[in-house]
Structure formats: C-alpha cells, structure tokens
Amino acid sequence: MINNDLDKPSLSRRDVLSTAAAAAGALVVGFWMPKRAVAQIINPAGAAWAVDPAVDEINAWVVVAPDDTVTIRIAQTELGQGVWTSNAMMVCEELQCDWSKVRPQYASANRDGREMAPEWTLEVMGKGATDPLGGGEPQFGGRDRIGSTGIPNSLYRRMRTNAAASVRDGRYYLQLAGAEARERLLLAAAKAWGVPVEEVRSANGVITHLPTGRTNTYGQVAPLAARTPHPNPERIRIKPPSEWTLMGTEQKNLDVPFKVTGKTVYGIDVRLPGMKWAAVKSCPVYGGKVKSYDFERIRNQPGVISAIEFPIPDPALIRDRVFSGGIAVIADSWYQAKTALDMMPIEWDVPPKHAALNSANMRAALIAAMDKPGKVRVNLGDCDRAFSGRAKIFEATYSTPYLPRARMEPGNATVLVTDDRVDIWIGDQSPQETRFSASKITGIPEQDVYLHMCHLGGGFGRNGNGPQAEQAIYLANQNRGTPIHLLWTREEDFISTTYRSMGVARLRAALNADGWPIAIEVRTAMDEQAPGPTACFDKASRYYVPNYRFSTHTEAFHIPVGTRRGVGTPAHDFYRESFMDELAHAAGKDPYLYRRELISRTNLPYKADMIKALDTAAEMSGWGTPLPQGMARAIALEERGAEAGGHATISAQVHTVSISKEGEVRLERVDVAHEEGFGLVNPLSVRKQLEGQITWFYNDAMHQECNVTEGRIAENNFDTFPLSRIKEDPPEINITFFKTGHWLNGMGHDRCTSVQSGIADAIFQITGKRYRDLPFRNHDLTWS
C-alpha cells in the first residue's frame, strides 16, 4: 500500500511523483510517493484494485489496516465539493470508527465494471423523501456510460459525478456498507472471544465485551473480519438522524492536508517512465478539420518525434457533441511539443455555414424561434382567453450568453496502450464512459481498460468525459508501448470544451387590477442539444397563477453545448426571478411580500417551507429597514427541480448591493436561508459550497460571457475572459439552516444562482435602468 503519512517531508509540487495509480495495491490518489517508486507505477499483470496482502478489506468500501487506519473507498470524484469527506462520513457514521484515522481513496472503475453489487446493498429502505429512513426508488442503478446499456447494479452503483447526486443517491448504500463492515468486525471479535455477538459493542474503532470489559481495536480483528461471512441482514440497521454522532457535524475536508502540502496528484502531474508529451491544436471553428500541415518545417526541432492528425471525434463517444479535428505534435517535453506546434504551418478546412455565424445573428435566430411553434411543456388553464381579455399585459425578453467552465487545470490525460491493455490517468467525472471510449478507439476489450483516477483542478459541470480523453487515447493508440501525456494550453481548454448554451426567454403576464398575475406564458429558446431545457418552468408555477403555459424552442448551432454549473437552472432562474421582481414593481408591491402572497395561494405541499425560507432570509437581512442612497436589497427563492415526490432543496437569499455613481457594482452582503431537511451530512461543506456559488454566479452576473465571431469563440484566455477579483467578493455572507421534514435533493451547483436577478433588481432600484441581458458589465450602470 502506498505510504500516506502526512508527516513525511514534503517535496516541491513538481517533484512529487505525479501518478494516480498503485497497480500492485489498491488505487490511492493524493499521497506522497518517492521517485524510486516510479518503476512500480504500472504492473500490467496485476489487477488495478488488488489489495495489499498486509491490509484487510472488510468489504468493497472499507479497508482496515493493522494500525487501525481505516480506508474508505469513494466512487465519486473529488472536485473540491467535499465528496471525499461527506461520503466517508456516511460510511463511518455506521462503521463507528475513529474519524481521525480515516483516509479516503478512489474506488476502482475497473473493479466496478467487473463485480456486481452485493445483495445487501440492493435494498433501499423507507417510503420516500419525508421518511428519515427512506429514499424512495434508488436513482443509481446501472453503470453510467455511453453507447451501452451497462450492467445493472454494478459494484459501486454510480461512478458518475454529476446532478448533485453523490450524497443524495449514495447515502443508503454507503451507510449500509459501513453497517455491514461494523457487524463483521463485531462478529469477528465475538468469535475470537468465544462469546455471543449480542455481548459486544463498538465505538470509536474499539470493540468492547460488555460483561468483562475486554477490548480489541478494529485493526486487531480486521484479518478475521475480512474472512467472516456476511452478517444477519436484520443486524444491519441504518441509524435515523436522531442517532447520528458524526453526520451533521462540521468536518474539515479530508483532502485538504494533502493539497496544502503538495501531495495531491492531479492529472496534470502524472509522470511515467519513457513518457512523451503531446501538444494539441484543434480547428478553432467547431466542425472544422485539418486541410494541410507542413511537418517538414519542424521535423528537426529539438525533441520532436512526430505530428499526428486526429479526426473529428466520433459523436457516439462524446454525447453527440460537435467538436473539431486537429493536430498534435509528440515530443520529449511539452515545451518542445508546444513550441514546434506553434511553428508548424496549418491550414484549416472550415464549414462556410459555421464561419458565417456570430453572436448577434445567433441571438436573433433564437428570438425568432420563439415566434414559431415550439414544444409545449406545460399548459394549465386557458392562457389565450386570459391574454385576450381586459387584463394589463406585461412582457419582458431576457438573454444569457455562452459560458465555459474556465476550470483552473487545463484538460489533460496520460494514456499507455499496449497490445492487450489500456491504462489511463485522468481526473474524470465519468470514468466508465472514458473506459468505454478507450475500448472503442483501441479495439481492446473494456475489461482490459484500466482507469487510474486523479484529482481534478475544477470541474464545474464536466471534466474528463470530453475530447481530451479521446484525443489522448487516439494518440497513444498510434504510439503503442509509449505513455503519452496530452496537455491542453489554456487557449485549447477554452475552445475544446462544451459551453452552456446561449439562451433567450420571453415572459408575458396578464395582470388584474390589483397587480396579481392571472396568466403567465413562458417561452425559452436555446440550442437543440442543450441539457436542462425545462429547468425552473417545467411544473406548475411556485408562484400562484391560474393560467400557465410553458414552451421550449430551439435552433441548431455548431457550438458544442453541455452541462455547466447548474445546467439550465442558472439562466432560467435569472429569467423567472427577474420577471417576478418586475411584476412586483409594476404592481407597486414589495417584491418579498409579492412572492410570499403568491406562494401562499398555491396548493403546493411544501409551500410552508418556501414561506419559511423567504421569511428567514428577509429577517436576517433587515428587510424593510432604510439603506443609504446607492444601496438596495433584492430577494429571490430557489429550489431545484421537482424530484423526490415534488420536493427539492429550498434556498432563499437577500442580496444587498451598492452601486457608485460611476457605475461600480459591489455585492455588499448576502443573507441565505437554506433548507437543512432532517439533517445535513457535513454543514461546513454546505456552507463552503454556498459561499463559492455566490462568488461564481456574481461572475456570471457581472463579467462572464463568450462571444462567437466568424464561427469561433472569441475569448480564449483570462485576458479576454475576465473573472472577479477578491476585492469583489461580498465582505459578509450569512447562512442560516432551517429544518424541514424532508431528505434533501443535493447541493449541486445552483443554490445561489439568484445573485444574477438580485443584482439586476438592485441596478433598477438604484439607477432606474432595467437590464435583461447578461453580463451587466456591458451596460451603463452610472447614475446621478
């Protein structure tokens, strides 16, 4: 087993042996390894998940060492969201071990592909979201991968990291894994002592025989426990929240010590014996390819080995997204590869229809699409009759731009292909998809594709399951026997990604004489491949309106679109909450009380929780108290989707904003009332995610956009794609959790998207100007 002792002297970050695999032992990422261990990185004869014989596996999730160190295997990818910690807490709540001795470890995607889930993990107890021991139907059956139905109930159930599902979908079987391991340890101790198992108890990693007071540690009985048959299922009981001792407490992230001491291994850090480097340049216009290139110009450059053209990726391997063909230079170092690539003449073959597109004509096409028949998603009451009457009609059109993820770690992957095996080192949110792609590209059976998980320098909706993996696999397949490390430049990372789709929305309301809506019609338009087209609008409105219609409209563009923080919710939340603010102002009513009254009129089963969120946030902020000139407050309410029997996590925020007369915007304070349900796993992690989301969506509101010029994205680095600076972060963020009788839908990326609508309404209150197109830096925000 790789040494993970934090007391080892740390090397410089680039001297840390940067690989994510321990082929002779269980896969461990983020731990110090001396350079002498380089030769042990790859062991083609060994299974990627093989267990060190000195360490005993209790089950697929729990490994206990003789020194009582407990390793918890985590199937989801740590992106900074705290999943290593939260998922480990769920296992350890039931395992009842010493939390200070817990170490996280990535579970093996290879093992997941070979083994079936134990029968005892297939029973999900409870009757639904309101049952503290329930979760309704499991949402994690089957393997997540493209082009294949997969194997239902594979070992780790769900290895994709997305949709705010790591805690939500994992809680029950992870707690069961901890409970099963605990019972095996108890049975082993009872057997060793020759006593009934009913006479032994465990706490903090120590097993006690109650009548005699004898004790054993988990490490002492682990070898016997590993060989103990599965316990009686009746003994594997999951604790209700009232019995939690670890879950619900604030715990620092387990991965932080490794990161701050330079011991974490990211994909960009991987180094292998004999490894060569690949620098890549893709056609800047999506759907384009290489027309010609002149390798002779660089053949004799230092370190250059070859130039390889790669085709437009097979859509079957990358979710039908349109990317580009390109070319890579292979060299002894990345600097040599990149320098030669920049010197080499390349001519691109660009589809003329793509080159003719720009942001202006694409936006115009989306607006025109809303005038055509769309797909009606919701049609309640009789909107046509309501709009044809004597009601006052209020209409507004909003727009949001293309947005990338702008992650800190550029795309990269290291791949070694031999005649009978593929090894991949990558930070990946969908490892099974990447294994499937590797099998298709190389022709090597998927069972012989080994993915060694690395940490990621940000994901924000997607990482790994895109063209960097396919490109690296393609190049390594052309250089069998030689490890190829592909690393994108920052510019390549911008243009070889998928974007959140450009979008527009037209919202129309019919208001009665008192200013209350009697009908609302929503039309949205975005790229036809954009995910989340119905977010926020797909159910009966949370705000009471007797007549409601929602339709979606699409256009087919060549810019690849995909998941990006919150998917469709951030844009749609901006449309909806901004429109509610505008309706309140048109009616001459307080936006907080306007929302509160409309919610109270609905028959939604959880309207009391939404009102509680609004009331709490308003009270926290001092809503209604006077503010100095140039300052304003705005309120908004969020929930995600309608999963879990019509219930989802509820969050209300009040944004206090100041704007100088010169137009400088500052988010002074944010007050958040966030639903706790019947318990959060790690409240500290939730707080950090909420704070991070506030900063992220402030960027969306004020700065971030990608423009299309001659068919290509114009912004390709941080000099043209501005991000907020630390001085722009709100100096005060207050978060209050409130309990409800529900299990939560997950944190995800979209709990604080309403920063956008909050700033929009504050701009209106302070300057008298109503802007409906993001980002706001494009508008005149001065006032006098």
In which residue ranges do the predicted regions lie?
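Structural alpha/beta core scaffold segments of enzyme domains
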Residues: 2-674, 705, 710, 717, ...
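Amphipathic, heptad-repeat alpha-helical segments used for oligomerization and assembly
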Residues: 567, 736-751
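Cytochrome P450 core scaffold surrounding the K-helix E-X-X-R motif
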Residues: 677-681
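Active-site "cap" helix and flanking loop/linker of ATP-utilizing ligase/carboxylase catalytic domains
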Residues: 684-720
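Conserved phosphate/anionic-ligand binding catalytic regions in large, soluble enzymes, centered on
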Residues: 694, 750-759
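C-terminal glycine/acidic-rich active-site capping loop/insertion
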Residues: 723
